[in-house]
Amino acid sequence: MAVQAPEVDKLSLNEESVAKAPTKGSAAQGTAGDEDAENEESDEDDDQGVAEGAVATGDKKKRKRKPKKKKKKGVAKVQSNPPRVPLSTLFPNSQYPEGDIVEYKDDNAYRTTNEEKRHLDRMNNDFLSDYRQAAEIHRQVRQYAQKELIKPGRSLTEIAEGIEDSVRALTGHMGLEEGDSLVAGMGFPTGLNINHCAAHYSPNAGNKMVLQHGDVMKVDFGVHVNGRIVDSAFTVAFDPVYDNLLEAVKDATNTGIREAGIDVRMSDIGAAIQEAMESYEVELNGTTYPVKAIRNLNGHTIGHYLIHGGSTGKSVPIVKGGDQTKMEEGETYAIETFGSTGKGYVRDDMEVSHYARVPDAPNVPLRLSSAKNLLNVITKNFGTLPFCRRYLDRLGQDKYLLGLNNLVSSGLVDAYPPLVDVKGSYTAQFEHTILLRPNVKEVITRGDDY
């Protein structure tokens, strides 16, 4: 998701405090190997005892006693299709796969001993575990979506609900009881942004849109565990004519990740991203289009229960000329880039689906009882996490639009309308969440797909 951020949550991310998790996508299986070794030793002892007994009896026929079969413990369960096995079942020891560990470039590769100690003192042991659990859920769900859900002829509603139902199942929190969604679940509603629409479009109730073979669709959704949000997005196109567009944006995002680090200026990251992206061209129907970075969309910090990091949050530009603000140790960032064959500039358009309660909003008297009741529902079920209209529908809310609009106009809830470039253009997006740990940066949402 691309917007400004609330307050940055600076818990330490020291690499030494969390044991290395098993390989991505597989649960820890160490205990099974140890038990097999013990079984082999006990079997050898049994066989030796049988042999000695046979010698002692002389004429008695030797009989080899069959070893008892013991059940192996610790063997990983396999994820179902569609994904419905909670991740905690697949990883019973809570050792979730770590992300892609990247060394810092040059001047910020070394952190002093005192700094490391300070971060160890402030370390929250659950911090990395929550992030890694959320990231592994994102990987498993998007893998399922790419293989099974996202196909021409499928409705956007079917795709969105398939993704969201899978996320909720893997977190073990379906979000139908009050406050359940605040424990774990969707960290950002599923955006299914087609062609010239770059961001913030999710189907509302009654939506009849169907994915077509010639479409370019951005799939953007977030997962959270205990308020630790991972935000990641990818683009799908079935026609290879769009390959260069997708490659340009993927290259730009990876460039941003490579350049990011402690004490790095946002302006330098933006310049590197733009240079990478705008070195590509796309040929459509005999016309060559330069790929343009969408200059008014940015990456952002991520805070605790805050997709945009808080009132003191930072933005990561994707074009040159940004401010001189620096990244800092302990921060979490969504590095996302958007490319377009159009103007490279987006504006608000179409029906709103995305909303979020404003953190630390002033006390505003509400005249409409429907607005008061709805604000209570939003606060108890989503807090400051973004939500969409379908989430209110599944909680049994109806006829809430008047109250919702009143909350927006009162400044208590933010509306995030879809963002579009010119009609006829095509846009693409890739996004990862990174953690700026003291000695390394961890691309927490990295997978085999992107």
UniProtKB/Swiss-Prot annotation:
Enzyme Commission number(s): 3.4.11.18
Class of the enzyme per the UniProt entry, highest EC level: hydrolase
TM region(s), chain numbering: none
Acidic residues: bias regions: 33-49
Binding annotation for a divalent metal cation 1: D220, D231, E431
Residues where substrate binds: H200, H308
Keyword Metal-binding: yes
Protein name, as recorded: Methionine aminopeptidase 2
Amino acids binding a divalent metal cation 2: D231, H300, E336, E431
